[in-house]
Amino acid sequence: ELTVVGSGWERSLLERLAESLGQAGMVTFKEHLDDKDKNIELQNAHILLHTSVREGWGLNVIEANAMGTPAVVYPVDGLVDSTIHGVTGLVCEEETPDSLAVEVMNLVADPEKYHMLRQNAWGRSHEFLWEKVLPNTCNWLENLASGKI
């Protein structure tokens, strides 16, 4: 089963594609989710697929990791920073559906690796808790404002 969250200009194309492939019953499309519903979706997900070709950071990767859900991502700036290949998730070799499919199939075929990625993803997500991030960010901003950097 595949759940696609969000809206965009390709949504209707994806809905028609699922229908034409006879997979409409296996694909669920959801609009914007509030934090509670988003967390439920991420907890229930086996894998987060992130196929953006431009990304600043990949916050939803860390959010998924916090729910114990590893990500399979395209090899673009931001996503390669939020995903440690083979440790917290997988980074595709190319920005293509075929490359994504290879990574997903390899992961599905290796339950031990999947379990390890889940544990590591959850553990790494704790590095991004406000209690850890906020002091460093404040120090950096203070140094920037005072001309130290």
Annotate the PLM regions.
Residues H32-L33, I40-A45, T137:
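Short alpha-helical donor nucleotide-sugar binding micro-motif in glycosyltransferases
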Residues S99, N106, K113-E127, N139:
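A short, well-ordered alpha-helix in the C-terminal region of glycosyltransferases
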Residues H85-G86, L90-P97, N106-P111:
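Conserved acidic donor-binding segment of nucleotide-sugar-dependent glycosyltransferases
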Residues W130-I149:
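C-terminal alpha-helical cap of glycosyltransferases
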Residues L13-L33:
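Nucleotide-activated donor-binding/catalytic signature segment of Leloir-type glycosyltransferases, i.e.
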Residues V61, P70-V73, T83:
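Short hydrophobic beta-strand element within catalytic cores of glycosyltransferases
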Residues V53:
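Aromatic "clamp/platform" in nucleotide-sugar-dependent glycosyltransferases that forms part
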